[in-house]
């Protein structure tokens, strides 16, 4: 590239020297000069801008026209995310806007400020023009979608719906038909499946008051539209040669096989026949295919784990065209998604749709025969009654008896066929069940053996166990997954209880709270009518020594986890909604943040609050109870200056939403939590999904973040311990400041156990402050230069510290380090932001509760008259466990689960959707992510039409 020519092009485009620009473009066309027409400037006056951006901004129409004719990219982005259309619209240059639109400028591109060209302009006429063009472009896309649905072009439908700004999937034509109508009446099954997955509404009607179901042809299509399910009568194996892309080796030819929802690839066809030397495979659950319109052979498959695999159909392969591959992948993806992603807890759903359809047809035939038999018996009895009157009816009588006999025989045959089908189906299912049970038995024994050997190997490499932690994690409230699940969480009740017997030690009483904190566990402050908060539970916890964890967890392999009933002994007497409320234990940090005028100091307090939210999990081995759908919890703390309401808004996946507000109208704190779980054999990892938002009303600021990932180690053998790791990014949406905290993984010798480090940065990524500490104990702030110097010096001494750490670990292999003031080295010049409060003396006997947690389930007669009947405090199983009545708690827990299951079945039969009471789903006003927003009116105390969940 000729850098000098590019600089000249940028200069002349900026200054409007049309003749000079034309000369350069002609020289480039003749290949006399090699330069990029879309080059970006590097000097201060044109940094990151292309010649077209500059010409549009400064209003040089002739230059713009010449550049576009020469092939300049009309939708090129500068470093601020602006297209040339943004710049022309911003400066109010109507003629240039029209010219750019003639060259198909995209009006939907959003720049770095979150604005489209329409939103960037101050000119009313330009805004109206862009709105009209947007409508036209959108309608063109809708017409393309309708046409593709009519013709069954699944790849085109997928490409249109995968655009950054896709057409409305529920758009309609002149007759009111949506794309789903069009695909349904033409019997394009793959298109229907794709549209349904993309949010097409099967209940919409056209102008003739017809739904897609009314226009559908065939039982299979109708079944898909009725239940939004897929009938898999005979999922065919599909195979053939495909080129597959690789990051390091480029394109390579494989023999690719699609079977039972799994995509596998082999070096050659004979390997696929014998299922040997498989080079790789991918389950197609929730897989999405995308294509490039410019290449008729290329397509890619995005799998459920966000990995993308590129394929190319060989040009000489006529039998396996790209369209056939796409249809086959869509079909196998639908199969895999249906059987892997459906709610398996709904007992009224048939597991095998195809067998159920066969049985239905067989029963229908039997019913027809039975009705005929009833009619013949009726006529036969009538003839018998008339037999005394007419003696000459004997021949007719005998003939009728023959007909009756034949009808009986046909009925018996039909019922026998039906019985045979039932018998065959039962035999096949029993055989498959025995096979799966044997597989699970072998796999679980092998897993236990491998885990034991691995544990012993680790102990031989490191003379002693690494430092362990037995913290309980909020997000782990009812699950393990065979691979990865966002569904019902029921199985992890056993997980966090495993180490209780090994670590029943109270927290170090040497810890102290910083002066700004307030006592959560005592005092005379009023809270829902309670004058003095309790400092103990009615009954201490029971011993868990007699319960085997692995004997329960091994049942999780290959099974739906929500079906496994866990002993209530592994619980603690709190609902998960109450555990969420423990975020508010250190509310004083929010009040302190509001009192500061410096945004950096406010961010420090918010970061400390985010870290302190998980601190209560230290040594909390009990698992909170699963909230029932519609369950609520409220807490009013006048002494801490807040009130909170939470609700279980979804059961599959389990989502808990909460909303807290300051009593002095100084803050709002809200969010929704649900975990994404992965089972790795020896450990379980939970990635907490959901956005947490804090609004400081006095400063008109909003902060958002997500919690770190939590991992439970040694669930099979060895000491159970939990660590939290991953980055937590706290964003100030007003100033653009960010705080990036790194929750560090433990490491080989436990050097980084529980450590948290990070920086506060402004929007230009300049470091303003460094933060460090442990999430189990404290957090400090220090100047970033001082912190970097300390880290650099610490790195030099790493080997010496490792040796020292290894020696100390070998002496105390089974001990968990208790956090104290010396476990975090305080860098000179540091300021303490937060320190954890000491726990009450009886904490070890009270489920290792903090003083704050001790009062969460407290209730009296006055409070019972105020709170709604859905409040956690009124749950009989939690109340029984708190009172030490374990047997009653277990019975009540089972009763409530069965009641919830029955209510779900009744709603399914009546086609009634569950409606949340205090929250509604919508985008987070600051991050844009899907969230649950408080609807208001809870504190009006008008609790009518509440569900009966207890």
Swiss-Prot record:
Region (Interaction with RAB7A): 1-237
Subcellular location as annotated: Late endosome
Mapped ANK repeat ranges: 47-76, 80-109, 175-204
GO process annotations (BP): lipid transport
Residue ranges of domain PH in the record: 235-334
GO molecular function, one term: cholesterol binding
Matches recorded under InterPro entries: Ankyrin_rpt (IPR002110), Ankyrin_rpt-contain_sf (IPR036770), OSBP_sf (IPR037239), Oxysterol-bd (IPR000648), Oxysterol-bd_CS (IPR018494), PH-like_dom_sf (IPR011993), PH_domain (IPR001849)
Region of interest (Disordered), ranges: 795-821, 881-913
Segments forming a coiled coil: 430-463, 877-913
GO cellular component annotations of the record: cytosol; endosome; late endosome; organelle membrane contact site; perinuclear endoplasmic reticulum; plasma membrane
Motif mapping: FFAT: 469-483
Pfam families: Ank_2, Oxysterol_BP
Annotated keywords: ANK repeat, Coiled coil, Endosome, Lipid transport, Lipid-binding, Repeat, Transport
Bias (Basic and acidic residues): 890-901
Expression across tissues: Detected in prostate and liver.
This protein's domain notes: The FFAT motif is required for interaction with MOSPD2, VAPA and VAPB.
Record-stated family: Belongs to the OSBP family.
Function: Binds phospholipids; exhibits strong binding to phosphatidic acid and weak binding to phosphatidylinositol 3-phosphate. Stabilizes GTP-bound RAB7A on late endosomes/lysosomes and alters functional properties of late endocytic compartments via its interaction with RAB7A. Binds 25-hydroxycholesterol and cholesterol.
Subunit structure: Interacts (via FFAT motif) with VAPA. Interacts (via FFAT motif) with VAPB. Interacts with the GTP-bound form of RAB7A. Interacts with OAS1B. Interacts (via FFAT motif) with MOSPD2 (via MSP domain).
Protein name per Swiss-Prot or TrEMBL: Oxysterol-binding protein-related protein 1
Provenance organism: Rattus norvegicus (Rat)
Gene label: Osbpl1a
């Amino acid at each position: 590239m000729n850098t000098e020519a590019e600089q000249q092009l940028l200069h002349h485009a900026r200054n409007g020297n049309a003749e000079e620009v034309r000369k350069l473009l002609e020289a480039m066309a003749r290949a006399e000069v090699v330069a990029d027409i879309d080059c970006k400037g590097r000097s201060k006056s044109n940094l990151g801008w292309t010649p077209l951006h500059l010409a549009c901004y400064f209003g040089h129409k002739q230059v713009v026209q010449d550049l576009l004719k020469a092939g300049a990219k009309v939708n090129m982005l500068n470093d601020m995310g602006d297209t040339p259309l943004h710049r022309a619209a911003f400066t109010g240059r109507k003629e240039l806007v029209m010219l750019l639109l003639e060259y198909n400028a995209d009006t939907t591109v959003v720049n770095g400020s979150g604005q489209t060209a329409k939103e960037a302009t101050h000119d009313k006429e330009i805004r109206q023009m862009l709105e009209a063009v947007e409508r036209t472009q959108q309608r063109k896309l809708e017409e393309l979608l309708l046409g593709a649905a009519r013709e069954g072009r699944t790849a085109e439908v997928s490409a249109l719906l995968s655009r950054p700004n896709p057409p409305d999937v529920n758009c309609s034509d002149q007759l009111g038909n949506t794309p789903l109508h069009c695909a349904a009446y033409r019997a394009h099954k793959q298109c229907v499946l794709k549209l349904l997955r993309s949010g097409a509404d099967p209940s919409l009607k056209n102008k003739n008051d017809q739904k897609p179901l009314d226009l559908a042809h065939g039982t299979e299509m109708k079944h898909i539209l009725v239940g939004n399910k897929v009938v898999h009568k005979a999922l065919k194996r599909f195979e053939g040669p495909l080129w597959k892309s690789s990051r390091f080796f480029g394109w390579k030819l494989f023999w690719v096989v699609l079977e039972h929802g799994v995509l596998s690839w082999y070096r050659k066809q004979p390997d696929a026949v014998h299922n040997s030397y498989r080079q790789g495979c991918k389950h197609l659950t929730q897989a999405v295919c995308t294509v490039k319109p410019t290449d008729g052979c290329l397509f890619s498959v995005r799998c459920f784990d966000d990995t993308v695999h590129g394929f190319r159909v060989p040009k000489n392969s006529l039998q396996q065209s790209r369209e056939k591959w796409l249809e086959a992948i869509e079909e196998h993806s639908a199969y895999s998604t249906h059987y892997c992603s459906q709610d398996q807890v709904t007992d009224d759903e048939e597991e095998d749709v195809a067998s159920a359809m066969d049985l239905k047809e067989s029963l229908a035939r039997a019913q027809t025969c039975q009705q005929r038999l009833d009619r013949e018996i009726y006529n036969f009895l009538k003839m018998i009654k008339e037999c005394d009157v007419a003696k000459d009816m004997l021949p007719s009588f005998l003939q009728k008896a023959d007909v009756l006999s034949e009808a009986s025989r046909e009925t018996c045959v039909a019922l026998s066929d039906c019985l045979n089908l039932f018998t065959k189906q039962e035999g096949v299912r029993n055989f498959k069940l025995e096979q799966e049970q044997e597989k699970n038995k072998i796999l679980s024994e092998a897993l236990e053996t491998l885990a034991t050997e691995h544990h012993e190997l680790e102990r031989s490499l490191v003379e002693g166990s690494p430092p362990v932690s037995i913290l309980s994690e909020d997000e782990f409230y009812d699950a393990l997954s065979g691979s990865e699940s966002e569904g019902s969480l029921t199985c992890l009740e056993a997980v966090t209880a495993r180490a209780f017997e090994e670590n029943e030690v109270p927290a170090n009483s040497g810890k102290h709270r910083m002066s700004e904190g307030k006592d959560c566990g005592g005092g005379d402050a009023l809270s829902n009518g309670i004058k003095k908060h309790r400092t103990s539970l009615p009954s201490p916890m029971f011993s868990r020594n007699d319960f085997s964890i692995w004997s329960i967890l091994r049942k999780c392999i290959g099974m739906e986890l929500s079906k496994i009933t866990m002993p209530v002994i592994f619980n603690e007497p709190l609902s998960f909604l109450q555990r969420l409320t423990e975020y508010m234990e250190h509310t004083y940090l929010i009040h302190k943040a509001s009192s500061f005028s410096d945004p950096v100091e406010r961010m420090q307090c918010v970061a400390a609050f985010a870290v302190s939210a998980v601190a209560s999990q230290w040594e909390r081995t009990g698992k909170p109870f699963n909230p029932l759908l519609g369950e609520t919890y409220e807490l009013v703390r006048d002494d801490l200056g807040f009130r909170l309401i939470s609700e279980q808004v979804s059961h599959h996946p389990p989502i808990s939403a909460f909303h807290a507000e300051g009593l002095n109208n100084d803050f709002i704190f809200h969010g929704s939590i649900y975990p994404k779980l992965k089972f790795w054999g020896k450990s379980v990892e939970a990635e907490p999904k959901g956005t947490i938002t804090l609004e400081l009303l006095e400063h008109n600021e909003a902060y958002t973040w997500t919690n770190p990932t939590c991992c439970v180690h040694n669930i099979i053998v060895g000491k159970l311990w939990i660590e939290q790791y991953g980055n937590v990014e706290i964003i100030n949406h007003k100033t653009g400041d960010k705080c990036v905290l790194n929750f560090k993984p433990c490491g080989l010798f436990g050097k980084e156990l529980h450590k948290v480090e990070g920086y506060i940065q402004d929007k230009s990524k300049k470091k303003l402050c460094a933060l460090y500490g442990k999430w189990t104990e404290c957090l400090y702030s220090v100047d970033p230069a001082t912190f970097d110097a300390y880290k650099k010096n610490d790195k030099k001494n790493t080997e010496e510290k490792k040796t020292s750490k290894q020696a100390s670990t070998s002496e105390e292999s089974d001990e968990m380090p208790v956090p104290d003031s010396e476990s975090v080295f305080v860098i000179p010049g540091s300021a303490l932001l937060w320190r954890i409060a000491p726990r009450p003396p009886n904490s070890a006997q009270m489920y290792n509760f903090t003083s704050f947690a001790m009062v969460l389930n407290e209730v009296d007669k006055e409070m019972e008259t105020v709170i709604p009947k859905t409040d956690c405090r009124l749950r009989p199983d939690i109340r029984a466990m708190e009172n030490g009545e374990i047997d009653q708690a277990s019975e009540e827990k089972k009763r409530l689960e069965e009641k919830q299951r029955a209510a779900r079945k009744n709603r399914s039969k009546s086609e009634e959707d569950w409606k949340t009471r205090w929250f509604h789903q919508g985008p987070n006003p600051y991050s844009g992510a899907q969230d649950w927003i408080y609807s208001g009116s809870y504190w009006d105390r008008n609790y009518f039409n509440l569900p009966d969940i207890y």
